[in-house]
């Protein structure tokens, strides 16, 4: 199974988010899965990458050519992308399930882009697991409900999103995706 992980590249992250990234990465690696991610060598990207590899998993980094100087040299495979849009497209095509860890606008962009992509595909097996730790994604989830309430979004699309509030719950949802 190939699991995309979207997460922050910032280095000044609170310890609780680092621990969550480590837990998810450890789960991925210990289940012989392959992680597909942004491929960079800093922030939660580096944390989750290290946890996957230490636990026996493999990692595929998808890196825009313009920022390749920051890529993680420990990636098992690196795929270069023309730009950020190409990176997202490649990650979506390579992955079976998508995990969105707490992050900033980049992670939010990846989540929304993936959600939109999945809404136009008939393959309902692909899911998004949103780690809503400390309610970090509450506002976007509320906005989706507003769109549903105003008939701007099909409520059935929300079935593609599984919401976890802890790394442990995220791993339980990942296990369900293996079935």
What are these regions (language model features)?
Residues 1-57:
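Glycine-rich beta-alpha loop segments
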Residues 8-11, 65-67, 103-106:
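Short glycine-rich anion-binding loops that position phosphate/pyrophosphate groups of nucleotides
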Residues 42-100:
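Acidic/glycine-enriched connector segments
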Residues 43-50, 136-148:
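Glycine-rich, charge-decorated loop segments at or immediately adjacent to ligand/cofactor-binding or catalytic sites
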Residues 62-63, 101, 117-141, 155-157:
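Short, acidic/small-residue loops that bind anionic groups at enzyme active sites
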Residues 86-122:
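Active-site/ligand-binding-proximal alpha/beta "capping" segment
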Residues 97, 150-179:
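A charged, well-structured terminal subsegment
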